[in-house]
Amino acid sequence: MQTKEKLASLSYLAVKSLLYELNLTPKPGLVDCHNNGAHNDMDFYTFLDSILSLSPFFKKYIEVGWLYHNESPQYLFNQLRKLGIEAEAAMFSATERVNTHKGINFSFALLLGATGSYLAKHIELIQEKRRFMPQDSLTICHLAGEMSMHLIQNDLSHVETKRNLTYGEKLFLQYGLKGLRGEASQGYPSLTQKALPFFRNELLKKQDIQISQLKLLLYLMTFIEDSNIIHRGGIKSWKKVQQEAQTLLEKDLPPYQLKEQLNSYNQILTDRHLSPGGAADLLSLTLYFSFLEQLI
């Protein structure tokens, strides 16, 4: 397999991760195979259209990383940002202006770009002379952090003087929450230090892959800064969801009971109009690195 084809095949793992996340059912408050959760402006097919619109750009992200691997992280970020804006426009066109994957597009631009850059310096992985290991995933995330660390300084350092604030900027001013920019600029610690170790351990149990993913989703809901929930319900609602997810996870239910409980919890979050979209995004990123490491 030639290098360009290999890079394309690896970018498809990001597409695959989004498809796995979409197909995962039942997901409390989220769009899945059975219902639209807390969303009245999107459904399963909206997400499919969105994923298809982003797929060509995922391939470009990893190619840009490969091409500019000798450039500075800041230079690489700027190239990826240009592509990311184009990808976002394609997404909005495909979904009739519904925001399905804006956050995950940002993260995959960084992480696929970082993957391409890392592969250019580790040809043995492209040549399949060795497998991706956890240390490779960690280094890729650290590179993404180097590429985006300026975001906090540039975007949030003078935010108090801005007139028109984004919701993320308002959260930063009011609560000190740095959201996706903060997570990225630190090299995705929630992914490398929590999500991936948890999921690797779940996969060792040899249980149904969907059950492992559902447990991962619950686990992510217990700790991440989920701006989707905060935006819809405020800080108290977010904290309550964290506690409820923790309680459900600690029950360690057998598969059929877990799905029953998640179906019930889906109705609860839907009634509250709450959607843990941040957890869903981090689940997709976890799946991407799990595919790279050939864990699933």
UniProtKB/Swiss-Prot annotation:
Example of a GO MF term: triphosphoribosyl-dephospho-CoA synthase activity
Catalysed reaction equations from the record: 3'-dephospho-CoA + ATP = 2'-(5''-triphospho-alpha-D-ribosyl)-3'-dephospho-CoA + adenine
Superkingdom, natural source: Bacteria
Span of the signal peptide: none
One record GO biological process: prosthetic group biosynthetic process
UniProt KW keywords: ATP-binding, Nucleotide-binding, Transferase
EC number: 2.4.2.52
Keyword flag Transferase: yes
Pfam families: CitG
Family: Belongs to the CitG/MdcB family.
Protein name: Probable 2-(5''-triphosphoribosyl)-3'-dephosphocoenzyme-A synthase
Organism: Streptococcus mutans serotype c (strain ATCC 700610 / UA159)
